From Swiss-Prot:
Annotated TM spans: 30-50, 59-79, 108-128, 129-149, 154-176, 180-202, 232-252, 253-273, 284-304
Protein name: Protoheme IX farnesyltransferase 1
Organism of provenance: Lysinibacillus sphaericus (strain C3-41)
Keyword field: Cell membrane, Heme biosynthesis, Membrane, Transferase, Transmembrane, Transmembrane helix
The keyword Transmembrane helix is annotated on this UniProt entry: yes
EC number: 2.5.1.141
The encoding gene: ctaB1
Quaternary structure annotation from Swiss-Prot or TrEMBL: Interacts with CtaA.
Length: 305
């Protein structure tokens, strides 16, 4: 039972608690965590199907892998916020982050980031040694190669950042089958090729913000036309990659090809688009739907492979 004073206190602290939770989720980049967990699970699920092992007999592996992946991805996101706290106030997209508003102090952010990374790695190593090592590779690729090195110095920063974004499905696969195989390579390449056109679309929408923050994104350095050609290149590279997964059957290959061709057609329309911002937004939204549908379809078709 609660008395009136307790109820009043609860009502008064409710919005504050909600705000703290919202800021914490922003700190760990929960959207990126969730999307990467989809690809992590896809890699793990594919490994179960390809090795004929039953997932119900290895629920501990699934738990360790998913929690571990969530923690290292969230920890890496928090570390990125810690590193970028000097430029985030400049950009509209990032100026409300808790590291900018002062909600979370730098030492707290660093503590959270390191704690998540350490606990996450312990869980991944509990799943398999290979999963733990790939987790370390992902952390290094995102925190060091991307956040600390290429992001502020090189126009190829998006491509460098795509390495870390392609590792989660490898982590999932390695947790079940450490030897990996063609299936794991296919998922890595698909995710690697998908990311540049996705993030270039976002960069086009935020070109002036990146310019103000002196981040050498491709649209800032080379312009929109060069960016469109680069997006087209990566989508063309993506076209044959689903065929590295022939085990999933003709249904999957047909769906994946349709998704890729739809993206290709939209990319080609960019060269005649009258409103680049509107086109970039359509490309960005399509890329999100593309990734979601593709990886969910891999999970579904793998059951019948």
């Amino acid at each position: 039972m609660s008395n009136g004073r307790t109820l009043a206190a609860t009502r008064n602290t409710g919005p504050e608690t909600t705000s703290v939770v919202k800021d914490f989720l922003a700190l760990i980049k929960i959207g990126i965590v969730n999307s990467n967990l989809v690809t992590t699970f896809t890699g793990m699920w594919l490994a179960f199907q390809f090795t004929s092992r039953h997932f119900l007999q290895e629920l501990d592996v699934i738990l360790f892998t998913m929690l571990g992946a969530a923690l290292i991805i969230g920890g890496s996101g928090a570390m990125n916020n810690f590193i970028d706290q000097d430029i985030d106030p400049i950009m509209k997209r990032t100026k409300a982050r808790p590291t900018v508003t002062g909600r979370f102090k730098p030492n707290f952010v660093l503590t959270i980031a390191l704690s998540f990374l350490i606990v996450g790695e312990i869980l991944l190593f509990a799943a398999s040694f290979a999963a733990g090592m790939w987790g370390l590779a992902g952390i290094f690729a995102y925190v060091v190669l991307y956040s600390m090195w290429s992001k502020r110095k090189h126009v190829s920063n998006t491509v460098v950042g795509s390495i870390s974004g392609a590792i989660p499905p490898i982590i999932g696969f390695a947790a079940v089958e450490p030897a990996l195989g063609p299936g794991a390579l296919a998922l890595f390449l698909i995710m690697f090729a998908w990311q540049p056109p996705h993030f270039y679309a976002l960069a086009m929408k935020r070109t002036e913000e990146y310019r103000a923050a002196k981040i050498p994104m491709l649209p800032v350095v080379k312009g929109f036309k060069r960016t469109k050609y680069s997006m087209l290149f990566w989508i063309l590279l993506l076209l044959p990659l689903p065929f590295l997964l022939p085990e999933l059957g003709i249904g999957f290959l047909t769906l994946a090809t349709a998704l890729n061709l739809g993206w290709l057609i939209l990319a080609l329309k960019g060269f005649t688009a009258k409103d680049d911002m509107k086109w970039a937004n359509r490309m960005f939204i399509y890329s999100l739907n593309h990734m979601t549908i593709l990886f969910v379809s891999i999970i579904i078709f793998a059951v019948f492979s």
